[in-house]
Amino acid sequence: MDYEEQLDRAMDEKPDVTGSETRFEVPDPNVRKEGNVTVYENFQATLDALSRTQDHVLKFLQNEVGTSASIDESGRARLTGEFGQRRVSDTLDAYVETYVTCPECGLPDTNLETDGDTIQLHCEACGARSTV
């Protein structure tokens, strides 16, 4: 049996793997207006999915949308001003790309590590370290 026949046989006998394409999913932001404030209802669920601190994510949101923000007693983020779901979602996508996804392997298995004034993204999957 030559290589091509072995390869064909292996491909025929391999099991079909089904499931979702990714195991990492950030919930879509659930935002609503409350007066002149935008309330991010599922902020805690987003933090759980990202495995990041609320202070870091909230600071990024504030800087990107150019407003002040706080966390209320229910754990919801309150952004001063009116921001739509799309704007918050795009901001979260930018956060994930910068602070969660490994630039080398593309996996979300990362930790943020502080070294002096520098923040590094350390990938648990491939071992890469990059400054963010």
UniProtKB/Swiss-Prot annotation:
Domain of life the protein comes from: Archaea
InterPro entries in alphabetical order: IF2/IF5, TIF2_bsu_arc, Transl_init_fac_IF2/IF5_dom, Transl_init_fac_IF2/IF5_N, Transl_init_fac_IF2/IF5_Zn-bd
Keyword terms: Initiation factor, Protein biosynthesis
SMART domains the record matches: eIF2B_5 (SM00653)
Pfam families xref list: eIF-5_eIF-2B
Gene Ontology molecular function terms on file: translation initiation factor activity
Region listing for Disordered, in residue ranges: 1-30
Family: Belongs to the eIF-2-beta/eIF-5 family.
Subunit annotation: Heterotrimer composed of an alpha, a beta and a gamma chain.
PANTHER family cross-referenced by the UniProt entry: EUKARYOTIC TRANSLATION INITIATION FACTOR, EUKARYOTIC TRANSLATION INITIATION FACTOR 2 SUBUNIT 2
Described function: eIF-2 functions in the early steps of protein synthesis by forming a ternary complex with GTP and initiator tRNA.
Name of protein: Translation initiation factor 2 subunit beta
Species annotation: Halobacterium salinarum (strain ATCC 700922 / JCM 11081 / NRC-1) (Halobacterium halobium)
